Amino acid sequence: MAGQRISVLQRARMQREMRKESRTGKMRNSMKQTEQRMKTRWILVFLAMLVCFCGWWAVRKEGFFADELYSYGLSNSDYAPFLSWYYNGERAYSGTSAEHIYSREDFMSYVAVQEGQRFDYASVYYNQTQDVHPPVFYFLLHTVCSLFPGSFTKWTGLGLNFALFGGTIAALYALGMEIFEGENSWKKSLFVCALYAFSGEAISNATMIRMYMLLTLFTTVLALLLAKALRRPTLVRYLLIGIVIYLGMLTQYFYVIYAFLLCAVYDFYLMLRREWKHVVQFSAAALAGVGGMMLTFPCWLAQLHSQSTVSLDTTTDNILNLSQYPKGPLELTGWSIVEFGVGAGIMALLLLVALTKRFLPGKLRQTVLIAPHAKLITIPALAAFIVIAVISPYKSLRYVYHLQPLEALFCGCGFFAVLDTLGQNARKKITQAVCALMLVLAFVLTPERMYIGNRKVNEELEQYSDAQCVSLIGDMTAFTSELPEYLHFKEICAVQDTSSTLLREYCTGESDSMVVFICGRGLWQFVTPGEVEQITQENQASAEEIARLGGYTSVEMLDTQEFSQIWVLKK
């Protein structure tokens, strides 16, 4: 009986201990779940803050680049891709407009969706067949603008870009989680996101209303899908890669360079592992994406031959021109160093470590700076940068904006590989210093195409809203670049030169003042100060001639802009 009582007591004690352990386990699981939820919320808040930072700069954007106005026109104009089409002008890209008196409504019809034209994707598709770019970005911009018919504002385009920027940041974070290992992988991924988002290139990309932000999203998503396929290749992932390639090529043709290099490297990787089934599946999916683009937008070949500056012929000339090889990459690299800021400094450090590795202390000497899987994703991006720098028609960073998230990932991998050789306190202090420097430079360095000062010019033009207005067209890009300023006036007399009969009929001298826009004549963002002075003298002579026609005695220049000068004539 005593033995039975002891056995009962032991069982009771064991049951109490098991219940206690169960409660403790549940509490631990609950605490882990709470910590995970808090970490997820913190990550989402941080990523949202990066997007909001771009909004801080977007508020300061006061003007439009000519190509941004083409974005609105090609998206929203009803079967008329360029202003030169409105009055039987030359129906070609950047053609010459017929002389005509444009009304304010004409310009609004070009850049804003009108009632009855909302969600008209057939018009958008048609407009893009007459342009030099595929249509996906313009479909999206038209969709956003269709929600606000009759409105022309930077915020429709910037709002779209913010959504695309947020998607890019999220994809970059997920890509970092695929590449980095260990319990701090999420912190390293956030660092890479910040390194990208706080760079001048990223902010310039997010605040430029063109297809490059969408191109960046598709580039990052392609890298993410392939990184996942490296860990666990599946047919579904290959099909998704094919879809992303299809959409990317329908966004901008330079997408094919990184996509081709990345796919070639991955195919070679699979061949080395003798995974022939995956070689066939992956290659078929990727080629299906390319073929789908060719079938759904068959005018791609004509577009690649449609201009003297943006064509396959120019690309071939640039490839064969040996002087391009040091010039193009070095020129673009120099600009990228300034815009990338801290990232460029990290890349220089990695280059220095790689060159002097055998002379460094043992732990750093044995460190692998870039892991093999990270190399497979990022090295094609660096190679694509060089290729684009050689073949691009203009040496502009916008053609390589889409590669920068992968450059940031490359820098992040090398940065943490070096840091991991140091002590914990040193790692913490260096990381904090680098993050602080990133934040400071992000506020100090002004992104491209902010046009700070245009607001003041527009306020001054508003004072002359009742005055007559003349525009010497020059070329259509220059003429289009002044569209936001034209909206201050009821009508604009657009002529080719001062000998125009229409100009002489228009200059009646009825108003006390006249505003004259003189467009083109070689004036644009890359001319030297000496050339600007010479062009200004020619423009002043034209303004004085118009003043004589209208009986005006005072001729003053109001502003010099990228493609034109604004003159005010008074009696």
Pin down the residues of each PLM region.
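Membrane-lumen/periplasm interface segments of specific transmembrane helices
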Residues: F268, L272, H278-N318, L322, ...
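Hydrophobic/aromatic-rich transmembrane helices and adjacent perimembrane loops
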Residues: D67, I379, I391-G423
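Signature aromatic-anchored transmembrane alpha helix within multi-pass, membrane-resident enzymes
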Residues: M1, V45-A48, L287, F415-T446
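Transmembrane-helix motifs of polytopic, lipid-linked glycan transferases
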Residues: T156-G182, V221
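Interfacial juxtamembrane loops and adjacent helix segments
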Residues: D78-H133, C145-G150
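Transmembrane alpha-helix segments characteristic
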Residues: L190-V192, L240, I245, A285-G291, ...
